[in-house]
């Protein structure tokens, strides 16, 4: 029994080190756009989990939403953050990430292995209301981050293509409201910038 426990401890340590690499995997979209000090995949998933935690939608299983947010990009600790600009077919991206998730979860006891893999699969297949909500959080968090980079660089509108890529993808009322508020703020910033002399 002590041996099994020691083995699972070693597996857990390897698992934690592996997912810890997400802190050092930059989000590729920002790298390609030459954003200074781009966020990590881990940064992105953390705020998504917080966004899930503060939802007021009682129809959703909030705990499950948080778990989905924390697992959805976990494979990127092995495969990296594959962006649309990488021109890797969706099926190939899925295959790589599926292999990575199998590799990652093999380090865990069977019950946890099953739970994490099934959460990842649920998100990938969008097979629940929670998965669909978290997918919208993923897109919403991205444009929120884009607006913050525009503010930090004092270049309103520079990352417009990230907004364009999410057009028509939001349907959950809370997220629609949040995005509307974000767009109002951003439009005001862009209007101010264009009104400044020399702009």
Swiss-Prot record:
Keywords of this entry = Acetylation, Hydrolase, Magnesium, Metal-binding, Phosphoprotein
**Which SUPFAM superfamilies does this UniProt record tie to the protein?**
HD-domain/PDEase-like
Q: Which domain of life is it from?
A: Eukaryota
What sort of enzyme, by top EC class, is this? hydrolase
Q: In which residues is a divalent metal cation 2 bound? A: 76, 81-82
Family indicated by similarity: Belongs to the HDDC2 family.
This protein is called what? 5'-deoxynucleotidase HDDC2
Species per Swiss-Prot/TrEMBL record: Mus musculus (Mouse)
Designated gene of the protein: Hddc2
């Amino acid at each position: 029994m002590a041996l099994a426990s020691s083995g699972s401890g070693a597996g857990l340590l390897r698992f934690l080190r592996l997912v810890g690499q997400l802190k050092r995997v930059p989000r590729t979209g920002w790298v390609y756009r030459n954003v200074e000090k781009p966020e990590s995949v881990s940064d992105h998933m953390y705020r998504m989990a917080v966004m899930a935690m503060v939802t007021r939608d009682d129809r959703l299983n909030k705990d499950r939403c948080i778990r989905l947010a924390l697992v959805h990009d976990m494979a990127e600790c092995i495969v990296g953050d594959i962006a649309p600009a990488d021109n890797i077919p969706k099926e190939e991206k899925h295959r790589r990430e599926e292999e990575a998730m199998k590799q990652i979860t093999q380090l865990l006891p069977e019950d946890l292995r099953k739970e994490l893999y099934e959460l990842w699969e649920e998100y990938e297949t969008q097979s629940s209301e929670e998965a669909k909500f978290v997918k919208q959080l993923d897109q919403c968090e991205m444009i929120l981050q884009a607006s913050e980079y525009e503010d930090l660089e004092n270049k309103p509108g520079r990352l417009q293509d990230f907004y364009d890529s999410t057009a028509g993808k939001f349907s959950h009322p809370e997220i629609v409201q949040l995005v509307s508020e974000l767009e109002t703020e951003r439009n005001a910033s862009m209007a101010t910038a264009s009104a400044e002399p020399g702009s």
